[in-house]
Amino acid sequence: MRLSTNPTLDRFDAVPAASYRPGHGAVRAWLYLLAVLVVAMVAVGGATRLTGSGLSITEWRPVTGVVPPLDAADWAVEFDKYRDTPQYRILNQGIGLDGFKTLYWWEWGHRLLGRIVGLVFFLPFAWFWARGMLGRRLLTGLLGLGLLGGLQGAIGWIMVASGLQPGMTAVAPLKLALHLTTASLILAGLVWLAAGTRPRALAPAPESVRVVACLLPALVLVQIWLGGLVAGSKAGLLYNTWPDMDGVLVPPARVLFDKVPFIENFIDNLALVQFNHRLFAYLVVAVAIAHAIQAARTASGSAAAGRAMGVAALATAQMGLGIATLLLHVPLWAGLAHQVFAMAVLIMATVHARLARGVPAAAAPTGAEVPIGLEALAGRGA
């Protein structure tokens, strides 16, 4: 049986997917569980950053570091290490042991969650692989994500180490942006693979819809990168007005480009860092809304049109949340919500992009399994 090219005529449960294998339901559930854990990592990492806790653990011990201080002597040792950091000497000299413990638990919890994510990835992965439940493409994608996850741990320590250098009271913004963007790439990869393991075939969306749908996750990732630079440099505290920036829509060039060499302005000039994040947000929302209108006209009534509308709605809501965060001078709850909601936008955009490509049909029907997760939004057709 072949799917028609009209996305409004094909039911998502009409034909089995060619790439589907027995047990893929468990694989799909595992991938979505990992995605949830990565979002939790981003949330805890955001809270760690916003509470200034990220430099409270001064060593990278991937194995033995899982055990926290267990008695007063252990806590004294860890506190002495922290008191030797520039952050303590410059910013936190008045902090006591109880205050240090609060900082420590945030960072320790973030690292512990990273270890848990690693175990939840590698143990089931080995089991699924041994049982032959992973096709070649899925296996390749998972191996790539596993390597990226290991690299992410190293990036995290490199980021922390940058904040322990003389004169530093926080991590380097560029390294923080890299850490956040890598986590986002891992999340997008997990969701992409999960959506691709749906049990039923799906006709691709019209080409014009498909092209823009695949562009949207890339735009969201760039915006997350720019947001990481804002977060790392605290550029969100420089201009707390909107739509203007302290009375002007665009700061003068002498303000935006006052550093030499020129390229450093895009990383270290707080005015330009915030301006770029604002400007790119407008671009993402404009593209998402235009895409939703395009999909509604080109594939009216299809699931692709519904998903496009969902991406546009989430992107617009995220921009509104970002504006509120800015106007409120970045309180912890708003900054954290803005960071986590960015992951929701990325997830929706990634699912939309993957399903817009379609899922090829098998030669003949072979059993049935109910789709779970966001790919169930495929509904009818593409």
Curated annotation (Swiss-Prot):
Q: Which residues bind heme?
A: H277, H338
Query: What's the name of the protein?
Result: Heme A synthase
Q: Where are the transmembrane segments?
A: 25-45, 112-132, 141-161, 176-196, 211-231, 270-290, 303-323, 327-347
Pathway connected to this protein: Porphyrin-containing compound metabolism; heme A biosynthesis; heme A from heme O: step 1/1
Its lineage opens with: Bacteria, Pseudomonadati, Pseudomonadota, Alphaproteobacteria, Hyphomicrobiales
Q: Does the keyword Membrane apply?
A: yes
Q: Subcellular localization, per the record?
A: Cell membrane
User: Which gene name does the record give?
Assistant: ctaA
Q: Which GO terms describe its molecular function?
A: metal ion binding; oxidoreductase activity, acting on NAD(P)H, heme protein as acceptor
Q: Which residues fall in a coiled-coil region?
A: none
Species the sequence originates in: Methylorubrum extorquens (strain CM4 / NCIMB 13688)
* Top-rank taxon: Bacteria
Q: Topologically, how does it sit relative to the membrane?
A: Multi-pass membrane protein
Q: What catalytic activity does the UniProt entry give for this protein?
A: Fe(II)-heme o + 2 A + H2O = Fe(II)-heme a + 2 AH2
| Cofactor names | heme b
